[in-house]
Design a protein with these regions (language model features):
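Short functional hotspots at interaction and active-site rims
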Residues: 1-166
């Protein structure tokens, strides 16, 4: 999450996954959610279960195959509503990371890299910040070696099943 200074309720929320398909380069698939309005007390600030399900649907469509997802224990990932959405997708299998195991999540180094690239950059409004975040994420999508580095940083070795780069 990246906040806009001077905008008490304005924020850009991000959701991403790194997809690994045998024989192919790793892919970064993401969604950006702008929140520029006041929220009700019972309304979530960022992504809902339905938003995460849409991200998974997009990944399924782009990868043209079943998905095995390893998730952290974010409330939206472990909720009953999310379990129902997962159960409705026969092409999806979900596993949870152990609690407090962020060092096993390859998306965490991605967020760290993104935040470092945004440090000391001032944007005047939510639209400018959103455009910058999307540009940085798009650049990462075209750098498979960088994504490989995120995977390697958690100790995941892809050499046994990922040979050619497609």
């Amino acid at each position: 999450m990246v906040k806009v200074t001077g905008g008490a309720n304005k924020r850009v929320s991000l959701a991403a996954l790194i997809a690994i398909k045998p024989g192919c380069r790793p892919r970064l698939i993401y969604r950006v959610h702008k929140n520029h309005q006041r929220r009700a007390m019972d309304q979530r600030k960022g992504f809902t279960e339905a938003d995460y399900a849409q991200l998974l649907d997009a990944a399924h469509q782009q990868l043209a195959g079943p998905l095995v997802v390893v998730w952290d224990n974010l409330n939206a990932h472990v909720s009953a509503a999310m379990a129902d959405l997962v159960d409705a997708r026969d092409w999806l299998r979900v596993y949870q990371l152990p609690p407090y195991a962020h060092e096993l999540n390859p998306v965490e180094p991605l967020w760290s890299h993104l935040k470092r690239s945004l440090a000391n950059l001032a944007k005047r409004n939510l639209a400018q910040l959103t455009a910058l975040v999307k540009t940085r994420l798009k650049r990462m999508q075209y750098r498979p070696a960088l994504i490989d580095g995120f995977l390697a940083s958690i100790g995941l070795d892809l050499t046994p099943f990922c040979n050619p780069r497609n």
